[in-house]
A protein has these predicted regions:
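Short, low-complexity disordered leader/linker segments with a strong preference
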Residues: 1-52, 375-379
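Signal peptide-proximal N-terminal region
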Residues: 47-48, 75-83
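Bilobed periplasmic-binding protein-like "clamshell/Venus-flytrap" ligand-binding domains
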Residues: 54-57, 110-111, 188, 308-320
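Extracytoplasmic ligand-binding site segments that recognize negatively charged/polar headgroups
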Residues: 56-72, 83-99, 106-247, 261
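Periplasmic-binding protein-like
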Residues: 156-160, 221-226, 232, 266-291
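Conserved active-site beta-strand-loop modules that form the wall/rim of enzyme catalytic pockets
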Residues: 239-252, 258, 269-273
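Conserved C-terminal helix/tail region of periplasmic/extracytoplasmic solute-binding proteins
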Residues: 241, 347-379
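Mature extracytoplasmic/periplasmic domains
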Residues: 280-281, 285-349
Length: 379
């Protein structure tokens, strides 16, 4: 399948990264990006976006994939305001925000979304997003984009545990460890599995370490049911603040979120990111423009910025693997220090789009009946 080719390519990148690190890093000679925009066309887009004056985003926490720097750089570079909606929203919430604001051009209507891989096709099928091909389109792998430009991959990471070792010095090394009584009242997901892509995929990943497979996510639901019955699962949406205070000592999240959290903590509290020893699970996110975007030119400019070399490297600074990584490596534009920051996630598996869709449906429809934990945002 096409998606499986993407997965092979992405895993190949990881191997290539380790080889580069061992050999002293990539070359530093810069080459122009593929499909660089024509100066006049880009100037027209910038002018049109500045006339709109604003971009409305949703579900972009500043500590997620370095979005804080991404947003501030965009604002400074182009002089636009950025209206940030619900930074802790899940992918399902993002689509619902578009549905609810079809006829609203006010501040609650998002221009752009960043959602889990399977949510891109859902959004297209429902007519919630519009096509736009960025100028670096050709350097995005074919398997990671809708051929008509409705959505395209932006970055990927691997699910991990971020552990406040000041509160819990005994770090879990694998999913099964989370059932140990020592973690009573200490483990939380980073979203609601009924709506959040990250939480859904965390449940999906648990199936791999508990007798399931990419074609069978049921053991993941069963595992979380046991975790809930044991009292170890806390029904709160974990974030870095809750990890820092010790209210949630063990957060299940993408590796890039955990690594950026540790940078933020600056040693207080001490913390570690653990890539599970089995069931390593990787996930791709995708970008798209709302079909009802109040600021369509600002949305297009945002996409151009994200998929420029500058934007891709900002994501990488936040420990994410940008989707144009292969092109960036080939042209030698990635600084050695960025390559050295990325963790070893060898052995991670990428589900196909069909597998993701099946797991998504199973988990969202059966979480309440099987697990019974009403996961909510922290008061």
């Amino acid at each position: 399948m096409k998606t499986r080719k993407l997965l092979f390519n992405l895993l190949t990148m990881l191997v290539f990264a380790s080889l580069l690190a061992a050999c002293g890093g990539a070359a530093t000679t810069e080459a122009p990006p593929a499909g660089a925009p024509e100066e006049g066309e880009m100037a027209e887009l910038i002018a049109a976006a500045q006339a709109e004056g604003m971009l409305t985003t949703i579900a972009l926490p500043h500590d997620w994939c370095n979005y804080g720097e991404m947003i501030e750089t965009f604002k400074s570079k182009y002089g636009l305001q950025v209206n940030e909606l619900n930074p802790d929203a899940g992918s399902g919430d993002e689509l619902e925000a578009i549905r609810a604001n079809r006829n609203n051009t006010g501040p609650q209507a998002p221009d752009v979304i960043d959602v889990g891989f399977s949510f891109g096709t859902t959004a297209k099928d429902e007519g919630l997003i519009q096509p736009y091909k960025v100028s670096t389109w050709d350097s995005i792998p074919d398997e990671a984009k809708d051929p008509d430009g409705y959505w395209y991959g932006d970055y990927y990471g691997v699910l991990a545990f971020v552990v406040n070792t000041t509160v819990q010095p005994d770090e879990p090394q694998d999913g099964a460890d989370l059932l140990d009584p020592k973690y009573n009242g200490q483990v939380a997901l980073s979203g609601d599995p009924r709506t959040s892509n990250q939480a859904i995929q965390s449940v999906y990943a648990a199936s791999l370490a508990n007798g399931g497979s990419l074609d069978n996510a049921q053991p993941g639901l069963d595992f979380f049911a046991e975790l809930n019955r044991s009292g170890n699962l806390v029904p709160l949406i974990a974030n870095n603040g809750l990890v820092a205070t010790g209210e949630i000592p063990v957060r299940i999240t993408w590796d890039y979120n955990g690594l950026s959290a540790i940078d933020t903590f600056e040693g207080n509290p001490t913390a570690e990111v653990v890539i599970p020893s089995t069931g390593r699970f990787a996930g791709v996110y995708v970008q798209a423009i709302s079909a009802y975007a109040p600021h369509p030119n600002a949305a297009k400019l945002w996409m151009e910025f994200l998929y420029s070399d500058e934007g891709q490297l900002i994501w990488m600074e936040g420990y994410c693997h940008p989707i144009r990584e292969e092109d960036l490596r080939a042209r030698g534009v990635i600084p050695d220090e960025l390559l050295a920051k990325l963790p070893d996630v060898s052995g991670a598996v990428f589900p196909s789009l069909a597998q993701l869709n099946a797991a998504n449906e199973l988990i969202t429809k059966n979480w309440d009946s099987v697990v019974g934990a009403d996961v909510q945002a922290s008061p």
